[in-house]
Amino acid sequence: MELKERFLKYVGFDTQSDPESETYPSTAKQLILLNYLAEEMKELGLEDVEVDANGYAMGTIPATPGYEDRPVIGFISHVDTSPDMSGADIHPRTVSYTHLRAHETSA
């Protein structure tokens, strides 16, 4: 699956947060996406994949042989969306612009 296809799949998940919740993640709906992401990470070859009790999906990519002593990097993001708008029944679309130009401005 291409990157754009993956992103469009992810935004189709209803991950609306609940500001009244005292749990992490704030809704069970967010766990659906987290578990989906964990399965994708496994399919992509990541190791030690897990979703922890606080709603973090984690996995590791082994170092390239010979580079095990190099610094590592981590990426983090959130899966919840605003409680102010419904996350249900989202139909994402892409719009391609083939010709964009900035208007000239004067100082």
Residue spans for each PLM region:
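Charged catalytic carboxylate motif
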Residues: 2, 32, 36, 98
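N-terminal capping segment at the start of a domain
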Residues: 2-28
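Charged/polar, solvent-exposed surface patches and flexible loops
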Residues: 5, 9-12, 39, 43, ...
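Conserved small/polar residues in nucleotide/adenosyl-binding loops
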Residues: 14, 98-105
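Short, acidic Gly/Pro/Ser/Thr-rich loop/turn segments
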Residues: 17-18, 66, 80-84
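Active-site cofactor/substrate anionic-group-binding motifs, chiefly glycine-
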Residues: 76-100
